[in-house]
Regions:
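Short, charged recognition helix plus adjacent turn
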Residues: 66-82
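Short basic helix-loop element that most often maps to the first helix and adjoining turn
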Residues: 9-27
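DNA major-groove recognition helix of helix-turn-helix/homeodomain DNA-binding modules
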Residues: 49-64
């Protein structure tokens, strides 16, 4: 069975958007600075609503902020090159 993990690119996006502070992002997303800190440290998985709010602040898709990664090895038996 495949398992997945979600990471985030919030810190990089803040830097790319004029070195936006955690406080500014928090205010624009309607959360506390502590929430942004927890998200950046991958200690908290946001609700779908919060994920959309953060994506809108940066004018990107949710997946650009929170990419989904497969924790299972790619490929498998019988998928090797010919």
């Amino acid at each position: 069975m495949m398992t997945y993990s979600i990471t985030n690119r919030i810190r990089r996006l803040r830097f790319d958007h004029g070195e936006m502070t955690q406080q500014t992002l928090a205010e624009q997303a309607g959360v506390t600075r502590q929430t942004i800190i927890a998200l950046e440290a991958n200690k908290y998985v946001p609700s779908l609503l919060l994920a959309y709010r953060i994506a809108r602040v940066f004018d990107v898709t949710v997946e650009e902020v929170f990419p989904l990664h497969s924790d299972s090895p790619e490929g498998g038996a019988g998928e090797a090159g010919a």
